[in-house]
């Protein structure tokens, strides 16, 4: 089972996460929801190694891209309500 990579609509289209990913999991796709007219997408999650470099590179303080490791759930991370 691969890790789950979630891209949220707070993405500003800066490409930092795409450049930080060592396994090319992420790519930019056209999107009209931000000034950059593009958003990160994760079409190759099976290649994700769970390093979370994309999270660290994100200038929106982890609000745009999140990597959930295989055994990680929103409940185990204290995010469930």
Curated annotation (Swiss-Prot):
Q: What class of enzyme is it?
A: oxidoreductase
Q: List the GO terms this entry assigns under cellular component, sorted alphabetically.
A: chloroplast thylakoid membrane; photosystem I
Keywords from the named record: 4Fe-4S, Chloroplast, Electron transport, Iron, Iron-sulfur, Membrane, Metal-binding, Oxidoreductase, Photosynthesis, Photosystem I, Plastid, Repeat, Thylakoid, Transport
The cross-references to InterPro entries, in alphabetical order and at most eight, read:
4Fe4S_Fe-S-bd, 4Fe4S_Fe_S_CS, PSI_iron-sulfur_center, PSI_PsaC
**Disulphide linkage map:** none
Tell me the SUPFAM superfamilies matching this sequence.
Answer: 4Fe-4S ferredoxins
Please list the cofactors this protein needs.
[4Fe-4S] cluster
Indicate how the chain sits in the lipid bilayer: Peripheral membrane protein
Which terms in the Gene Ontology molecular function aspect does this entry carry?
Answer: 4 iron, 4 sulfur cluster binding; electron transfer activity; metal ion binding; oxidoreductase activity
Annotated [4Fe-4S] cluster 1 binding sites? 11, 14, 17, 58
> What EC number(s) has UniProt assigned to this enzyme?
1.97.1.12
* Reported function: Apoprotein for the two 4Fe-4S centers FA and FB of photosystem I (PSI); essential for photochemical activity. FB is the terminal electron acceptor of PSI, donating electrons to ferredoxin. The C-terminus interacts with PsaA/B/D and helps assemble the protein into the PSI complex. Required for binding of PsaD and PsaE to PSI. PSI is a plastocyanin-ferredoxin oxidoreductase, converting photonic excitation into a charge separation, which transfers an electron from the donor P700 chlorophyll pair to the spectroscopically characterized acceptors A0, A1, FX, FA and FB in turn.
Q: Which NCBIfam families match?
A: PS_I_psaC (TIGR03048)
State the name under which the record lists this protein: Photosystem I iron-sulfur center
- Origin organism is Gnetum parvifolium (Small-leaved jointfir)
């Amino acid at each position: 089972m691969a890790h789950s990579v979630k891209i949220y609509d707070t993405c500003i289209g800066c490409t930092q996460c795409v450049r930080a990913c060592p396994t090319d999991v992420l790519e930019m796709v056209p999107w009209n929801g931000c000034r950059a007219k593009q958003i990160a997408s994760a079409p190759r999650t099976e290649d994700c190694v769970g390093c979370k470099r994309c999270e660290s590179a994100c200038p929106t303080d982890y609000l745009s891209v999140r990597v959930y490791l295989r055994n990680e759930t929103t409940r185990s991370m204290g995010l469930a309500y």
